[in-house]
C-alpha cells in the first residue's frame, strides 16, 4: 500500500495521499497557487508503520497547493402546506477549495 494520512479540516475528515485532489471547506487568506498546510493529522501510514494520534500525530503535516475555488451541487429545500397555496423553494450551493496534495511529512 502507498503512504496515506487522514486529516481534519472544516470539521470533516479526509483520507489523502500524494497527488490526490480534494475539495475542502473554504479557508481564509488562501489564494490560487498558494501552498496550504494541514496540521491536524489524525492518522498516518507510511507503507509499513501506522501512527494513530491522540488526538493528532505530532510532527506530521500534510502540504498541498490550492488549484481553484469551486461550487458544489445545488441543494434544493422545498416547503409547502397542503390546501393552503403555500410553496417555498430555495437553493444553496456551497463554496469549496480544490486542493492538490503535494507532500506528506510524517
UniProtKB/Swiss-Prot annotation:
Transmembrane segments: none annotated. GO terms for cellular component: cytoplasm; ribonucleoprotein complex; ribosome. PROSITE patterns: RIBOSOMAL_L21 (PS01169). InterPro entries: bL21-like, bL21-like_sf, Ribosomal_bL21, Ribosomal_bL21_CS. One of its GO terms (biological process) is translation. The keyword Ribonucleoprotein applies. Keywords: Ribonucleoprotein, Ribosomal protein, RNA-binding, rRNA-binding. This is Large ribosomal subunit protein bL21. It comes from Chlamydia felis (strain Fe/C-56) (Chlamydophila felis). The lineage of its organism: Bacteria, Pseudomonadati, Chlamydiota, Chlamydiia, Chlamydiales. The gene is rplU.
Amino acid at each position: 500500500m502507498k503512504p496515506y494520512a487522514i486529516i481534519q479540516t472544516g470539521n470533516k475528515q479526509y483520507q489523502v495521499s500524494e497527488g490526490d485532489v480534494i475539495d475542502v471547506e473554504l479557508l481564509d487568506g488562501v489564494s490560487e497557487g498558494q501552498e496550504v498546510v494541514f496540521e491536524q493529522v489524525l492518522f498516518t501510514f507510511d507503507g509499513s508503520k501506522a501512527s494513530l494520534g491522540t488526538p493528532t500525530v505530532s510532527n506530521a503535516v500534510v502540504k498541498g497547493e490550492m488549484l481553484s475555488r469551486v461550487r458544489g451541487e445545488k441543494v434544493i429545500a422545498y416547503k409547502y402546506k397542503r390546501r393552503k397555496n403555500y410553496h417555498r423553494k430555495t437553493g444553496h450551493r456551497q463554496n469549496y477549495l480544490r486542493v492538490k496534495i503535494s507532500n506528506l511529512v510524517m
